[in-house]
């Protein structure tokens, strides 16, 4: 009992650290092999523990994967909200949107989040529905910024903002699949490019007589 109290005073308990290790291992295995190919046995082997010991921390492989996905959305949300806060309350909604998109991109590249999203569709419906609720709450941050910009007359009319949001976030999420950290563009460059497309468009307008 004294050891347990001491561990809690010092921060994470041994169980907390084991759980965190299992999450990190599963995250890496999903990225390398996809969720279909991993098993509790392969997770245990990578974590250097017995498969049966996992049940002290998680009830199933699906529960571990759900936790990995939740940690991903939670981490992205934290990064995005921090970027918005850093932009300042007096900044325009478009500047805050740029900051949010940049933070989203940085996080998805760092965490290779696209590989985890493929696992969502394979979760049991109950776990999938829970994860999608988190995704909707996260997406609402970006939806709110677009709506604020629209109310302030900063956006052209005639666009479906839900589609704009989904296209923008979806495009940035999948950058990790092709991004080369040694290439000519940084994540900031890519986020700036997207904002240029959103704000000015790609196709030249014909000159009016």
Where are these regions (language model features)?
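Short secondary-structure transition hinges
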Residues: 105-143
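Amphipathic C-terminal alpha-helical segment
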Residues: 106-110, 139, 144, 148, ...
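Hydrophobic alpha-helical bundle segments that form small-molecule/ligand-binding pockets
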Residues: 86-90, 123-124, 136-164, 179, ...
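Short, basic, alpha-helical segments at the C-terminal edge of helix-turn-helix-like DNA-binding modules
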Residues: 70-77
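N-terminal intrinsically disordered/low-complexity leader segments
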Residues: 1-17, 206-209
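All-alpha amphipathic helical-bundle segments outside canonical DNA-binding/catalytic cores
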Residues: 91-99, 130-134, 151-167, 185-192
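Hydrophobic alpha-helical connector segments
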Residues: 67, 81-110, 165-168, 191
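Helix-turn-helix
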Residues: 17, 21, 25, 29-63, ...
């Amino acid at each position: 009992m004294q050891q347990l109290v001491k561990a809690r005073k010092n921060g994470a308990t041994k169980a907390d650290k084991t759980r965190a290790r299992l999450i990190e291992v599963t995250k890496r295995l999903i990225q390398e092999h996809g969720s279909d190919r991993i098993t509790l046995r392969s997770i245990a082997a990578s974590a250097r523990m017995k498969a049966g010991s996992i049940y002290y921390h998680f009830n199933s492989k699906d529960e571990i994967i759900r936790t990995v996905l939740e940690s991903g959305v939670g981490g992205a949300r934290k990064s995005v909200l921090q970027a918005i806060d850093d932009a300042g309350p007096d900044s325009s909604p478009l500047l805050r949107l740029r900051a949010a998109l940049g933070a989203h991109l940085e996080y998805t590249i760092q965490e290779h989040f696209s590989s985890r999203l493929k696992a969502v569709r394979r979760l049991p419906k109950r776990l999938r529905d829970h994860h999608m609720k988190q995704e909707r709450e996260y997406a609402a941050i970006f939806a709110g910024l677009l709506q604020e910009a629209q109310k302030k007359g900063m956006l052209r009319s005639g666009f479906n903002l839900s589609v704009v949001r989904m296209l923008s976030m979806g495009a940035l999420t999948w950058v990790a699949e092709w991004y080369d950290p040694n290439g000519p563009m940084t994540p900031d460059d890519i986020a700036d490019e997207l904002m240029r497309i959103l704000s000015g468009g790609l196709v030249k307008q014909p000159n009016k007589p």
